[in-house]
């Protein structure tokens, strides 16, 4: 019974479209009671014809009703559509997000697709040898590969050509970098540059003028601190007849804030050599006659923070260098701070010695500071009671000196060394 119903429904649909079939319909009806076999053949033909249009159109009306009843658990979170399968939902979501995970694997092709069937259809373009697009794509891919290879070669050649030049300025421009960044320069850079500086002071002065404006504070601070250190040397060596250094001792408290800043910036300097001390005095002798006297003095100050015998005195904590810390406190005349600093670690030992005469320092004595036996051998009882290096700053000799503190002279003596005083 269902086939006749479907055939009748199909005939009803065809009646308005085909008016010529109207006379044939009654003829078939009139012949139906006479020939039952004809009715069966007509019904079979009608059922077969009814299936042709859906198959040709790609639709399935017979299976569409049960398909609508199937559950659609996979719903799109961005719209109201739902899907029977997860891969269908994933493919649909890519239409919202624009994601294209399927990339063409052909060399030189950068196209991507959101569906795998689109990628398959696109890959046929590359696989077809007779396609014009394939030939064009191959040419473009070859050109892109050649350009990339040329670019890589150019970068490699540029890198190879740029490598040798930095090796030379590293050692020659080290003192300029030490002024701006005191913690970066290697320890051997200044020793290589010191011999070159002796004959090229003018060139260094010109190079220092090219420094960036960010180093102005460091230059001022190092210059002020170097002037103060020269004053200490001049006062200590003044009785020996050197008026060049003794003439500056009246500027004792000049720029204390800059000196404190320079001390904080250069606390981590822990490299020094014997030739550094010799060169520092040459610079100091030429300071009154040099118009750019502050430029050559900056590298010497950055390396005078240790004794001239680095093989015997490697400080474990160069950031807490004792020679630089009490220098600013003694100039600011803060006895309370000096009393508080009596309990520093033994790394502060080099600040303790106080010059009592020309026989205080011997070249063979290690520059670590006086031992306990040296402290106990002091004639003054107050000095024996205070084992910390900064004790001599509040000693009687320090209080008796009106215009200069013994701590500064002791600090300068510990930095320069007794053998340096004997040279004068």
Swiss-Prot record:
Post-translational modification: Ubiquitinated. Deubiquitinated by creB, probably to control its activity or amount.
Protein name: Probable DNA-binding protein creA
GO cellular component terms, semicolon-separated: cytoplasm; nucleus
Biased composition (Low complexity): 21-38, 288-302, 406-416
Localisation: Nucleus
Bias-annotated ranges (Basic and acidic residues): 62-72
MF-aspect GO terms: RNA polymerase II cis-regulatory region sequence-specific DNA binding; zinc ion binding
Coiled coil: none
Physiological role: Transcription regulator component of the regulatory network controlling carbon source utilization through ubiquitination and deubiquitination involving creA, creB, creC, creD and acrB. Represses the transcription of the alcR, alcA and aldA genes by binding to a GC-rich region in their promoter. Also plays a role in response to carbon starvation and the control of extracellular proteases activity.
Family (UniProt): Belongs to the creA/MIG C2H2-type zinc-finger protein family.
Region (Disordered): 1-74, 115-134, 161-184, 269-327, 347-386, 403-424
Keywords in alphabetical order: DNA-binding, Metal-binding, Nucleus, Repeat, Repressor, Transcription, Transcription regulation, Ubl conjugation, Zinc, Zinc-finger
GO BP annotation list: carbon catabolite repression of transcription from RNA polymerase II promoter by glucose
Lineage: Eukaryota, Fungi, Dikarya, Ascomycota, Pezizomycotina
Polar residues biased stretches: 39-50
SUBUNIT field: Interacts with creB.
ZnF bounds (C2H2-type): 74-96, 102-126
Origin species: Aspergillus fumigatus (strain CBS 144.89 / FGSC A1163 / CEA10)
Database matches in InterPro entries: creA/MIG_C2H2-ZnF (IPR051007), Znf_C2H2_sf (IPR036236), Znf_C2H2_type (IPR013087)
């Amino acid at each position: 019974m269902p086939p006749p119903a479907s055939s009748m429904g199909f005939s009803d649909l065809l009646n308005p479209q085909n008016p010529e079939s109207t006379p044939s319909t009654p003829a078939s009806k009139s012949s139906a009671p006479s020939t039952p076999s004809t009715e069966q053949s007509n019904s079979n033909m009608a059922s077969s014809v009814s299936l042709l249009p859906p198959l040709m159109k790609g639709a399935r009306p017979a299976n569409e009703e049960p398909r609508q009843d199937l559950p659609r658990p996979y719903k799109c979170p961005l719209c109201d559509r739902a899907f029977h399968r997860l891969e269908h939902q994933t493919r649909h979501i890519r239409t919202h997000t624009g994601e294209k995970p399927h990339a063409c694997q052909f060399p030189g092709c950068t196209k991507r697709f959101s569906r795998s069937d689109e990628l398959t259809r696109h890959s046929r373009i590359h696989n077809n040898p007779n396609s014009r697009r394939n030939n064009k794509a191959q040419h473009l891919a070859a050109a892109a590969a050649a350009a990339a290879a040329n670019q890589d070669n150019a970068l490699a050649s540029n890198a190879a050509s740029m490598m040798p030049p930095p090796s030379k300025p590293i050692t020659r421009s080290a003192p300029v970098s030490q002024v701006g960044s005191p913690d970066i320069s290697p320890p051997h850079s200044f020793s290589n540059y010191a011999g070159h500086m002796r004959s090229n002071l003018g060139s260094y002065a010109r190079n220092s003028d090219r420094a960036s404006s960010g180093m102005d504070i460091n230059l001022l601070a190092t210059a002020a601190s170097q002037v103060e250190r020269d004053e200490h040397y001049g006062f200590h060596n003044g009785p020996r007849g050197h008026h060049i250094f003794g003439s500056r001792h009246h500027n004792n408290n000049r720029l204390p804030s800059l000196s404190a800043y320079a001390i904080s910036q250069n606390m981590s300097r822990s490299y020094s050599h014997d030739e550094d001390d010799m060169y520092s005095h040459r610079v100091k002798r030429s300071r009154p006659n040099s118009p750019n006297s502050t430029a050559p003095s900056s590298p010497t100050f950055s390396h005078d923070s240790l004794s001239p015998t680095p093989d015997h005195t490697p400080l474990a904590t160069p950031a807490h260098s004792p020679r630089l810390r009490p220098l600013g406190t003694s100039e600011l005349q803060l006895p309370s701070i000096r009393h508080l600093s009596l309990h520093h670690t033994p790394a502060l030992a080099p600040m303790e010695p106080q010059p009592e005469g020309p026989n205080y320092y011997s070249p063979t004595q290690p520059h670590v500071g006086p031992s306990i036996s040296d402290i106990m051998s002091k004639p003054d009882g107050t000095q024996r009671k205070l084992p910390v290096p900064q004790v001599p700053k509040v000693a009687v000799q320090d209080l008796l000196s009106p215009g200069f503190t013994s701590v500064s002279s002791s600090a300068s003596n510990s930095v320069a060394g007794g053998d340096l005083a004997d040279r004068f």
